[in-house]
């Protein structure tokens, strides 16, 4: 069960960092 918790924390941290960088800079992807 600890592996699942560590994986969840890792994904959560990466997700927070990704959203922080994504919302800090204006999205340059034009569809």
UniProtKB/Swiss-Prot annotation:
Key words, A-Z: Chloroplast, Membrane, Photosynthesis, Photosystem II, Plastid, Thylakoid, Transmembrane, Transmembrane helix
A Gene Ontology BP annotation from the UniProt entry: photosynthesis
PANTHER family in the cross-refs: PHOTOSYSTEM II REACTION CENTER PROTEIN T (PTHR36411:SF2), PTHR36411
Entry's family note: Belongs to the PsbT family.
SUPFAM superfamilies attached to this UniProt entry: Photosystem II reaction center protein T, PsbT
Name under which the protein is recorded: Photosystem II reaction center protein T
Annotated Gene Ontology cellular component terms: chloroplast thylakoid membrane; photosystem II reaction center
UniProt topology in membrane: Single-pass membrane protein
Record text on subunit structure and interactions: PSII is composed of 1 copy each of membrane proteins PsbA, PsbB, PsbC, PsbD, PsbE, PsbF, PsbH, PsbI, PsbJ, PsbK, PsbL, PsbM, PsbT, PsbY, PsbZ, Psb30/Ycf12, at least 3 peripheral proteins of the oxygen-evolving complex and a large number of cofactors. It forms dimeric complexes.
Function comment: Found at the monomer-monomer interface of the photosystem II (PS II) dimer, plays a role in assembly and dimerization of PSII. PSII is a light-driven water plastoquinone oxidoreductase, using light energy to abstract electrons from H(2)O, generating a proton gradient subsequently used for ATP formation.
Signal peptide annotation: none
Organism: Stigeoclonium helveticum (Green alga)
UniProt-annotated location(s): Plastid, Chloroplast thylakoid membrane
Residue ranges crossing the lipid bilayer per the database entry: 3-23
């Amino acid at each position: 069960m600890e592996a699942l918790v560590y994986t969840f924390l890792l994904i959560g941290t990466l997700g927070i960092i990704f959203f922080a960088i994504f919302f800090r800079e204006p999205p340059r992807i034009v569809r």
